[in-house]
Amino acid sequence: MLLSVSASHRDADLADLERLSSGVGRVWADAPLVAHGLDGAGVVLLATCNRFEVYLDVADGTDPQRALAVVRDLVRTVPESPLAAPGADDDAAGPGPDPSAALRVRVGDDAARHLFGVASGLDSIVVGEREIAGQVRRAIAAARRAGTTTGALERLFAQAQRTSRAVEAGTGLAAAGRSVVGVALDLAARSAPPWPLARVVLIGTGSYAGASLAALRARGCTDVRVHSESGRAEEFARAREAEAVPPGELLTAIADADVVVSCRGSVRPVLDAAAVAGARAAAERRAEERAGHAVGTAVQPRPLVVVDLALHRDVDPAVGSVDGVELLDLGTIRAHAPAAATRDVERAREIVDDAVAQHALVRAAREMDPAITRLRGRVREVLDAEVGRLPVGPVSREDAERALHRLAATLAHAPTEAAREAARAGRGEEYVEALRLLFPD
């Protein structure tokens, strides 16, 4: 039985999603426990900047509320985010609200419909964005590597990817290049210099950093410097014809930048207010020097736009209070996400519904697999017995005919006895109808 336990930006605020996603490692570590506790065998985890979802393949008859309780127990003890919400009282005591309360469970076709819609970008902050398709693909790949996937989950996620491609091809949602990164850069462009003149620092080297760099290049930005605390900046930048920020030079690079895009997703912020304020002070001194003013003369550097695309905040919210700095985070992006055309969304949902119906047919057919296996096993047993009765060496036509007749008689014996029993029980018509299904005229 297919189940999904999930929360998204539609059900919870980003702070709760951040806390849920903090438990990704724990959910993976306890995946065998989840499967064992639910008498099932399959777990796939999908955690992105605006959702936390667990897909389960469990035994038929499993109570969905039990599955919900198991997942809630796994994530309930996730620690608070290392960042307080903007304006929070530092002296406030006690834990925040339980983030697992936002989780909800879906069963069967509802779970499939949800995943197909997610993979198609219909449940994203920016409706129709294509980044989620890659995240869905990586989720099933991660489960495969962890050994927690099953045939049913493989088929589900394969259909989700086919549905995503069908929505992309059959609607205009993807044609506009809609994405979280795209909306963020459009917002940044309101305050930044024209992209061909802008100096950008990119923090991170993961898939989101790659998407961000591609989006910057598409807008004509050529001056991009890449920073990574993991040491992968050189390799990442070289492969994409960008420049790496030397180790220890991040704040110097920020002092020269017009835009900072961070998508590292670290547990602790990469940038805090003090560091950014220091970089701004250095930028002001350089502006004074370029203007030929005496040191201490007020010369304001160009504004700095900081874009934080990480769910686990890379940038302390207090950075937004630094003079001359505009901070754009996922909350800002969600508030400014453009609406998709109603016609495209309706067509996309039709495609999703068709995919759900197709998946249900496939799933129903696969439910007969155990019966088919038993049938084939019985035929193999009878065949092996008859082959064992044949003489060693060449077999005459007469011996082959006798063996085949015995095989046919043996195979027909049980159905024949069942036919007589059905007639005695007054169920002869049911048997005849079943026979027509097996051997149509």
UniProtKB/Swiss-Prot annotation:
NCBIfam families, per database record: PRK00045.3-4
Domain notes: Possesses an unusual extended V-shaped dimeric structure with each monomer consisting of three distinct domains arranged along a curved 'spinal' alpha-helix. The N-terminal catalytic domain specifically recognizes the glutamate moiety of the substrate. The second domain is the NADPH-binding domain, and the third C-terminal domain is responsible for dimerization.
Pathway(s) served: Porphyrin-containing compound metabolism; protoporphyrin-IX biosynthesis; 5-aminolevulinate from L-glutamyl-tRNA(Glu): step 1/2
Residues noted as binding NADP(+) in the record, renumbered to the chain: 204-209
GO MF entry, a single one: NADP binding
Protein name: Glutamyl-tRNA reductase
Keywords: NADP, Oxidoreductase, Porphyrin biosynthesis
Lineage summary: Bacteria, Bacillati, Actinomycetota, Actinomycetes, Micrococcales
Listed GO biological process terms: protoporphyrinogen IX biosynthetic process from glutamate
InterPro entries with a match to the protein in the record: 4pyrrol_synth_GluRdtase, 4pyrrol_synth_GluRdtase_dimer, 4pyrrol_synth_GluRdtase_N, GluRdtase_CS, GluRdtase_dimer_dom_sf, GluRdtase_N_sf, NAD(P)-bd_dom_sf, Shikm_DH/Glu-tRNA_Rdtase
Chain's gene name: hemA
